Amino acid sequence: MRNTFILTLLLLLNIANISANIKNLNNNWKFFYGDIPEAKYVDFDDSEWKDIRIPHDWAFENGYSANASQKDKGGYLGGGIGWYRKEIYLTEKDLSDDFIFIDFEASYMNNQVWINGNFAGERPYGYIPFSFDIKKYLVEGRNIISVRVDNSMEPSARWYHGCGIYGNVSLRSHKNAFFEKDGIFITTPSKDKVCVNAKVISAEKSANYLAKLEIFDKAGKCKAQSETLEFSTNNNLSLIHISEPTRRSYIS
């Protein structure tokens, strides 16, 4: 059996500061097992809550039970509802970026997020990463992140799952323009052509950018490159032709 080996693709754009500023938020969270709707508010007193670090799994933390709501399919662990809160401090410089997102790598399940008492969004079910644009809710100085995670409808899976925020949490900011998170898609219409679909998010409603596509092999040698391409925030990038595509054989 023979498969075409797809070479590494590099996109070089002339957008200033296109790289993200990322701040890890895993440390110094407060956690409460139970449902307290008032926990979304800034002035809520969480001083008696448990100090935890992300990643966190309250089902495993609470232990096993023959009567646990996940039953045998979930390893005899429980479910329920949990609340998380975190305090962060931001400077005027931190808030100067055009876009500020909060990124959750994984949280199970049915997540709701508030920033300073403002509802930022929700992510039904679990397993996949999710993000919310929270710049408009942030202030200089003290900010409160509140997260409600609902595992009250158990069993909810055919195997053990964690309960809570079990993946990294981070604050991600961009100036002016950036590639949408997980927004670059590469397809091969034929063995010698690569099609790139790259979505750019811009602070300007309509903007044009220049891009150059280069493809490198495993040794770092440039195998193909495009001319400088002009595209807008609403258009895709173009095809690039590879005159001598590298192939790799697989035996199965």
Where are these regions (language model features)?
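Single conserved hydrophobic/aromatic residue that forms the stacking wall/gate
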Residues: 240-252
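Boundary at the C-terminal end of the N-terminal hydrophobic targeting segment
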Residues: 18-20
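Surface beta-strand/loop "capping" patches
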Residues: 176-204
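Beta-strand-rich binding/interaction modules
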Residues: 193-231, 238
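Sec-dependent N-terminal signal peptides
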Residues: 4-14
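Predominantly extracellular/luminal regions of secreted and cell-surface proteins
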Residues: 30-60
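Aromatic sugar-binding surface patches on proteins
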Residues: 128-130, 234-239, 243
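Accessory beta-strand-rich segments of carbohydrate-active enzymes
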Residues: 23-27, 32-35, 74, 79-181, ...
